[in-house]
Every structure is written in structure tokens, then in C-alpha cells.
């Protein structure tokens, strides 16, 4: 039978999982489906006590992924790089909880890039500048993507949009580099 989705918490606490390859382009990936850290309660600050760290270092997805990625879908991912896809629908925060993420790669053939709110909340503050390739017409950045410190735009006609819903600060971008022209 064809897999239509991966349920919420499906691989929860599977710390030995190293690679996820999604071949289906319309599957729904549930909340915390790959929350692979093994925890034992919470510390005094309310943070989970991790007793066995995740080993999930590679996520492979179809280029045109038309499925639904729910909140914290890949929160067990401990890789340092993620290749963005031509997403058309997903919930906010699907990369939330990826604390080792340092680099987001945007393919050159994308026309629009939509970074949902809360997507990069928990990434380290060492997240490298986002480099938007030439040919991208529009970039939409949702609320609370706190760790985006710099965006480098390679195209002369790329438009950067932000979401400032309900008066909240959308992002704390310190620097935007644009190609002259």
C-alpha cells in the first residue's frame, strides 16, 4: 500500500534513526513525527531532560513537495544544513526545534520562497545568512523567525515581504544585502 502520511509522534524517541527519505510528494508529516531525542521529564526551567540525543542527520524530500508539514515535524533533525523545497502548503514551525541548523540552501529554480512563522525559532543564533538566489521573485518571511540575522538577495527584482500580524515584530534581520541595480 502507498503511504499517505506519517502520524504525529510516529518516530518519537527513535534516537537511532539517522536518515529520512520521503518519496511521496503529497504526504502529511504529523507534529513531532521525527522528535527523536529521548527525554525523561523536565528540568527546573521547563526544558526537557534529554537522556539520549537524536542521530537524524539527513532529510531527503521530493523537490516539489505538495504535502503538509505540521508544527515541529522535523524537530529531531540534528543536521547542520537543510535544502529548501518548492513547498506549497505547510504549517508554521516545521523546522522548529532544529537547534543545530546552521545553513538553509535555496535551489536556484525557485520562483517564490515562503518561510512560515516560527520556522526558525529554535535554530542557533549562528544560523548563516540566508542567500536568496537570482530568479526568485518574492520572499515571504513569517512572524517570529528570530534567528534570521542577515538575508543576501542575489536578484535585482526580488521583493522581500514580512508578516507583522497583530503588531508583533516579524523578524530581527540586522542586515539585508541586495545586488546593486
Whereabouts are the PLM-identified features?
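Short, aromatic/basic amphipathic alpha-helical patches
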Residues: 72-73, 162-169
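Structural signature of tandem-repeat unit edges
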Residues: 1-5, 15-28, 39-68, 76-89, ...
Amino acid at each position: 500500500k502507498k503511504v499517505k502520511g506519517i502520524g504525529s509522534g510516529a518516530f518519537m524517541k527513535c534516537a537511532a534513526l539517522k536518515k529520512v527519505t520521503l518519496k511521496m510528494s503529497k504526504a502529511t508529516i504529523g507534529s513531532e513525527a521525527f522528535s527523536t531525542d529521548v527525554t525523561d521529564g523536565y528540568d527546573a526551567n521547563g526544558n526537557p531532560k534529554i537522556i539520549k540525543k537524536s542521530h537524524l542527520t539527513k532529510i531527503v524530500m521530493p523537490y516539489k513537495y505538495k504535502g503538509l508539514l505540521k508544527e515541529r515535524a522535523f524537530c529531531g533533525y540534528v543536521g547542520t544544513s537543510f535544502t529548501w523545497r518548492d513547498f506549497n502548503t505547510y504549517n508554521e514551525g516545521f523546522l522548529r526545534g532544529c537547534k543545530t541548523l546552521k545553513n538553509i540552501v535555496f535551489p536556484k529554480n525557485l520562483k517564490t520562497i515562503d518561510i512560515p512563522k516560527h520556522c526558525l525559532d529554535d535554530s542557533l543564533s549562528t544560523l548563516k545568512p540566508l542567500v536568496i538566489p537570482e530568479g526568485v521573485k518574492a520572499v515571504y518571511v513569517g512572524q517570529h523567525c528570530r534567528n534570521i540575522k542577515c538575508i543576501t538577495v542575489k536578484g535585482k527584482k526580488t521583493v522581500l515581504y514580512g508578516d507583522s500580524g497583530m503588531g508583533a515584530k516579524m523578524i530581527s534581520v540586522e542586515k539585508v544585502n541586495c545586488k546593486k541595480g
